[in-house]
Amino acid sequence: MQEVLWREGSVKWIRLNLFREKALVSHICYLVTFYTYLKTESIISSRDHDKSHLTEPENDIKSIVKGKVGNKLMTLSEVKSLFLTLKNSSAPVYTEGGSDKEFCLLANGFWQAEGYIGGIFRSGLNFYPLCTATQLFSIESAKFFIRLNKALCNKGTFSITLNSFGKFVIAYRLSGWDTFFSVFVPYFKMLYGEKYRAILKLNKIYALKNHIKQTSDNMSKVHLVSLVYSLTGYSSNYKVSLEEKLLSLGLDPALLKELPKVSYKDNAIKPSFLFILGFFLGDGTLHLKLEWKEKNSTVVICPLFNIVQSNAESNKYIMERMTDTLNALNIKTSLEKSATTYTLTVKGINNVFNSLIPLLKNYSHFLYGKSHSFNLLVWVERLVNSGGHHTYFGLIALVNKIYASTNKRFTDKEVWMDRIEDWLKVASARRDTGEYSIYSIYTSDHKVRGWQVRFPSTFKLPKSNKAFICSTWDGQDKALAAAVQYRDKILSDWINKNF
């Protein structure tokens, strides 16, 4: 029997819905942001020191509509004010840790997971490149984008919108050919799959765009439009089909068959751990699963690190490369394909606590919105390494710690408390004394003369073993009661002090 304590619902249900929500967040934010810009021209550039890219005029009624930032309800005006405070802070967020080179690798991984590289036709064949990335708004996501904008020479713009889930979303955008070639391309050299090929295609689109200015070559025009429609790898999802677009431009769709077949190689550079960490920031989870083994009344602690992507062919290459990189770092990693997803997984105490967490600790300043889950697992790691999870008080502390967070659960806390009581009964029944960590002291003729509290050597306790002799305590029962009281005090004080 399994229970997931740090995630809502079943694992498969969560993964699918997280994937759907992320996709919808990106889609809605993209549409709302650029529709707002075109219709209201309400963008204020992030290059203005005092203001940021705001999606609605300040006097718009939407400014008072409330949405969620985490679990807190805020108005759009309040969210914008919070963002401006962070952006214009006297202690800039881009000085909070890690070198610029390290952050660049992190940002490449994040853009691989969450970024969009494409554009729009402004009119006719006048194609305009747009590179965007979105996240649910939080202080941490705002800090990330502010630092990214600084790294990109403050060339980007920001927007804050309310999505259909009632949550605020922050979007970051770079636009225009000059910015694309002078800022985006030099910085994002570590992309893969469709995003890597999109950069190559945009180079070709730009060349065709200039060529078409000099000639009325219909084949070049068809080539340009077909490249635009292939940028994301999801051309079938466009509302206006490729053929319809060509017809609207007075071009014959039959010319598509005459285009030369061109294949684009993928990025051959091996992704770094920081790239994977950035990808994890966009599409990963770090969480804790508790399993209850009914047969022997045992609580099993299972930490997990996951990155999930749709099972589109374009995602296969990078998921395989990231899996290879982690395995090369002696972090045992699996990659599974389902009907809808690829899932990269690092699982178990040894793989997560002993192999992955030490690397994450080196870059904890780059964890942004994942800091809460990381800190929880670091706490659990300390408990496990000390042996505290093999004690009644340690298990109680573990469940209390997990349920102290605001995440919803489908198993009541009381269920786990009852299971811990069952664990205590079984663990105690294994000793002839009927108490765990308490052992009988026998005379030479095998009569009980007392009890000894003796803790396993794996417990990181100060020297605490102690004997309780029956003659000193006026009988076996009183000596055993004193031993139990001593054991519980030592263990509870140890857990309370350290955890």
Predicted regions and their residues:
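Internal intein/HINT superfamily modules and their associated LAGLIDADG
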Residues: 1-450, 456-460, 465, 470-473, ...
